[in-house]
A protein has these predicted regions:
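Sequence-specific dsDNA recognition surfaces
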Residues: 17-31, 46-76
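A short glycine-rich beta-alpha junction/loop motif
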Residues: 99-106, 139-160
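Amphipathic alpha-helical segments
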Residues: 1, 8-10, 120, 152-193
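Short amphipathic alpha-helical linker/capping segments at the junctions of internal repeats
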Residues: 35, 98-101, 175, 185-201
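Short, structured motif recognition centered on aromatic/hydrophobic residues
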Residues: 9, 14, 40, 74, ...
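A short beta-sheet element
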Residues: 44, 69-72, 76-126
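Non-catalytic DNA-recognition/assembly elements of restriction-modification systems
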Residues: 3-25, 188, 194, 199
Length: 209
């Protein structure tokens, strides 16, 4: 990625640097019966919220079914993207051997060392991404979901890995600070959240190509 150091930021289609896929519904219905208890979690759309995994309401998969779901196994650094229903929610997988992909959630698995999953997660939450990719796509059609081929066409601004890491470090600190205020006054929490969103969008807004 020498051009990153010459021009600062390069624009790349997601499908050129990541595997984007989903699990067909029949792959689950054929092999899996959900359970309300267990160890292996099937991550559904409702578990992907505000950049994080929300594990308040989960369904489990029996370990005896796992050998039939090799395409569904998730790894650290995998990013989930909701493409139907509440479109555009993202989260990163933070553990191995615990999570499997359920239907109606897209898996984005980055295949290049110059693109950091943590940077991707923050960028997918930014106003720049929503204004240039999601909103434009939804406004141009009556689709209630985003097909995989459209997701693969998402255009990403990719700065150097050093810049990506700096952005992630700053936003991680803001995120931690906001979480520390969850028991504070509502007005204070709202103000801090707006401040976080402002700096996130400033850091993740690049000159259009």
């Amino acid at each position: 990625m020498l051009c990153q150091y010459v021009f600062g930021v390069v624009y790349i289609e997601l499908g050129d640097v990541a595997t984007v896929t989903k699990l067909a519904g029949f792959e689950f219905t054929k092999y899996v019966t959900y359970s309300d208890e267990g160890q292996i979690i099937a991550l559904r759309g409702l578990n992907v919220k505000n950049g994080k995994l929300d594990l308040k309401d989960v369904k489990y998969i029996d370990k005896s079914d796992l050998s039939k779901l090799t395409r569904s196994k998730l790894h650290i650094g995998d990013m989930l993207f909701t493409y139907v229903g509440t479109i555009g929610q993202v989260a990163l997988v933070n553990e191995n051997d615990r999570f499997y992909l359920a239907p109606n959630v897209a898996l984005i698995r980055i295949g290049q060392p110059f693109l950091k999953p943590e940077y991707m997660r923050y960028y997918f939450q930014s106003s720049m991404f929503w204004n240039t990719q999601i909103n434009r796509l939804l406004q141009s059609s009556s689709m209630q979901n985003i097909p995989m081929e459209k997701i693969r066409k998402f255009v990403l601004p990719v700065p150097s890995t050093e810049v990506q890491e700096r952005i992630v470090s700053i936003l991680d600190r803001f995120d931690t600070l906001c979480n520390d205020l969850t028991s504070g006054l509502p007005a204070e929490m709202e103000a801090r959240t707006k401040q976080y969103e402002y700096y996130r969008d400033k850091l993740l807004t690049f000159q259009q190509k």
